[in-house]
């Protein structure tokens, strides 16, 4: 079980809701993945927009909703969006996203820290999407964030753990859960994040744009379980020199 703030999750795979062809396909993929925490953009909560009703199928699944502030370019915009989400969904949980650059969608560290500090004081459970910066992640932890969500690679890029070495430092130093978010494009990437010691991963694009999102959701669930189990079991040390698994020295000397 994974505990974030006051909530326990039976799955360490968190999922998103964007880029799916249909809401029912999104819901089926989420169910197949076993995910119990699902993030959704606040800007998609438009009353009367029935053709993009993602809320109803998610509520039917009984998952915990994590509204995000995607689209916010400043701390002020993110705080405003957070208030809207709390009013609309009745939750104080929030994935904080502030990325002013529309091309690479890299998070703004200064505005993110500023918004996080204010939102924590207002009683929000803040999970900030941020760069793989160990210093920033520690600062976010210190201001009261319930978890940190450093990126593996730019959003939707499917590049995997480009920031692997920095993620390892963040995981080593963190006293709150570390959720690797963004850039995870294959189940093997998710497994690698868990092998590093990550507490959870968030996956959206890789599932949503696959030929079979339901099957891909299931594949990610299996990969997350495998990676986590490998981490707990203890991976063997890497080395440049060979080490025979079945030495024959005694046998050969006896001939």
Curated annotation (Swiss-Prot):
Its EC number is 2.8.1.10. It is found in: Cytoplasm. It comes from the Bacteria. Its main location: cytoplasm. Keywords: Cytoplasm, Schiff base, Thiamine biosynthesis, Transferase. InterPro entries: Aldolase_TIM, Thiazole_synthase_ThiG, ThiG. One of its GO terms (biological process) is thiamine diphosphate biosynthetic process. Catalyzes the rearrangement of 1-deoxy-D-xylulose 5-phosphate (DXP) to produce the thiazole phosphate moiety of thiamine. Sulfur is provided by the thiocarboxylate moiety of the carrier protein ThiS. In vitro, sulfur can be provided by H(2)S. Homotetramer. Forms heterodimers with either ThiH or ThiS. This is Thiazole synthase. It comes from Aeromonas salmonicida (strain A449). The lineage of its organism: Bacteria, Pseudomonadati, Pseudomonadota, Gammaproteobacteria, Aeromonadales.
């Amino acid at each position: 079980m994974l505990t974030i703030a006051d909530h326990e999750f039976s799955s360490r795979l968190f999922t998103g809701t964007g880029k799916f062809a249909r809401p029912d396909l999104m819901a089926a993929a989420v169910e197949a993945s076993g995910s119990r925490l699902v993030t959704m953009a606040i800007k998609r909560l438009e009353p009367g927009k029935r053709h993009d009703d993602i809320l109803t199928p998610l509520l039917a699944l009984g998952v915990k909703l994590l509204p995000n502030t995607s689209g916010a370019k400043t701390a002020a915009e993110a705080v405003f969006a957070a208030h809207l989400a709390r009013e609309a969904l009745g939750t104080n949980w929030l994935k904080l996203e502030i990325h002013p650059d529309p091309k690479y969608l890299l998070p703004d560290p200064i505005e993110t820290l500023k918004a996080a500090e204010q939102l924590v004081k207002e009683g929000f459970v803040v999970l900030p999407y941020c760069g793989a910066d160990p210093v920033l992640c520690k600062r976010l932890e210190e201001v009261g964030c319930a978890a940190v969500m450093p990126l593996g690679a730019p959003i939707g890029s499917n590049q995997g753990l480009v920031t692997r070495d920095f993620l390892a430092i963040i995981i080593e130093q963190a006293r709150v859960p570390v959720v690797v978010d963004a850039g995870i494009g294959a189940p093997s990437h998710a497994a690698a994040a868990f092998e590093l010691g990550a507490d959870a991963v968030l996956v959206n694009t890789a599932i949503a744009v696959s030929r079979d999102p339901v099957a891909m959701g299931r594949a990610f669930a299996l990969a997350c379980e495998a990676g986590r189990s490998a981490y707990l079991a203890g991976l063997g040390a890497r080395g440049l020199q060979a080490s025979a698994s079945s030495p024959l020295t005694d046998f050969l000397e006896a001939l």
